[in-house]
């Protein structure tokens, strides 16, 4: 997902670039830590390992744009599936069963 259609950037700390993004990329030697299929190895993005707003270093990893895009897309699909499942009515128990 591109930043253009996302409100996610507003949730990042004001000092994201200087105190989060650059140190994470530098610590990884600017190499993608996801290393998935199609990886271009040159890290340009910082990914939250677990979804949410935990910006601790242990929850951040360097990622190339290809791996980051694929991971974010997969997480989005999983989240939509989870929300859709919550809308479904749970199956009713048979009245004769205890």
Curated annotation (Swiss-Prot):
Region (Disordered): 75-98
Comp. bias (Basic residues): 81-98
Domain HNH: 38-73
MF terms (GO), sorted A to Z: endonuclease activity; nucleic acid binding; zinc ion binding
Pfam families recorded: HNH
SMART domains: HNHc (SM00507)
Full protein name: Gene 4 protein
């Amino acid at each position: 997902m591109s930043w253009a259609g996302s409100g996610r950037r507003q949730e990042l700390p004001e000092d994201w670039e200087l105190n989060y993004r650059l140190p994470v990329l530098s610590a990884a030697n600017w190499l993608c830590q996801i290393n998935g299929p199609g990886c271009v190895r040159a890290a340009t993005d910082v990914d939250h390992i677990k979804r949410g707003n935990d910006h601790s270093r242990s929850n951040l990893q360097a990622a190339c744009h290809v791996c980051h895009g694929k991971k974010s897309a997969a997480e989005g699909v999983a989240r939509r599936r989870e929300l859709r499942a919550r809308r479904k009515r749970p199956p009713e128990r048979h009245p004769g069963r205890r």
